[in-house]
């Protein structure tokens, strides 16, 4: 398995570097993740530190040797992340639900040799997930992985995001080479 770890949100340089050092010392983490841009449901919530946090990810690579990843949702994010040496890009659940957003990212990475991870959409819609994968693949990206985070559910549940395992199982059946 590929172990991805790090803070959901990059809040300070110290937080990012301290977390990365501790994870690197474990020797079990393959990819350091930190959210630089955070799409929030409502305005006036913390939406990430923005591109200044990308310099922190560069320092993580330099100081720990860990490869880095962050979520991108639009062209500017892609260009800034690549300019700062981010190793792997990921599409978040809120981006995956919007074919226009996925296409914008796909156009921005066309011709770039970078791995892309694609989270399942927020709602349990296999076709949306497949559509995102196909758009990224058609942009010339061959190293695609998927992240199953579970799905939103309106009601009582013991999980924040309900797994609905039949959906990722069907995805793997249709795309057996996906990681």
PLM-predicted stretches and their roles:
Residues 13-21, 75-85, 126-133:
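Catalytic cores of alpha/beta
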Residues 6, 32, 81, 118:
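Conserved, mostly hydrophobic/aromatic
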Residues 101-179:
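Catalytic alpha/beta core domains of metabolic enzymes, predominantly
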Residues 1, 28-30, 62-68, 85-87, ...:
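Short, well-ordered coil/turn segments that N-cap beta-strands
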Residues 33-51:
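Glycine-rich, proline-tolerant flexible connector loops at the mouths of alpha/beta enzymes
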Residues 47-55, 160-167:
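Charged helix-capping and loop-helix junction motifs
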Residues 1-18, 42-48, 66-72, 92-93, ...:
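Active-site mouth loops of central-metabolism enzymes
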Residues 45-49, 66-78, 87-101, 114-126, ...:
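Catalytic beta/alpha-barrel core
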């Amino acid at each position: 398995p590929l172990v991805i770890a790090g803070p959901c949100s990059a809040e300070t340089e110290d937080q990012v570097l301290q977390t990365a050092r501790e994870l690197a010392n474990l020797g079990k983490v393959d990819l350091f993740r930190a959210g630089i841009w955070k799409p929030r449901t409502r305005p006036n919530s913390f939406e990430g530190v923005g591109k200044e946090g990308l310099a922190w990810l560069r320092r993580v690579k330099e100081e720990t040797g860990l490869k880095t990843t962050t979520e991108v949702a639009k062209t500017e994010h892609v260009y800034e992340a690549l300019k700062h040496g981010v190793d792997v890009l990921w599409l978040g659940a809120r981006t995956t639900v919007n074919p226009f957003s996925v296409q914008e990212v796909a156009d921005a990475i066309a011709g770039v040799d970078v791995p892309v991870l694609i989270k399942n959409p927020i709602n349990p819609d296999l076709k949306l997930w497949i559509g995102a994968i196909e758009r990224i693949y058609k942009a010339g990206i061959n190293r695609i992985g998927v992240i199953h985070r579970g799905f939103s559910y309106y009601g009582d549940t013991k999980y924040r995001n309900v797994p609905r395992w039949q959906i990722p199982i069907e995805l793997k059946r249709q795309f057996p080479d996906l990681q």
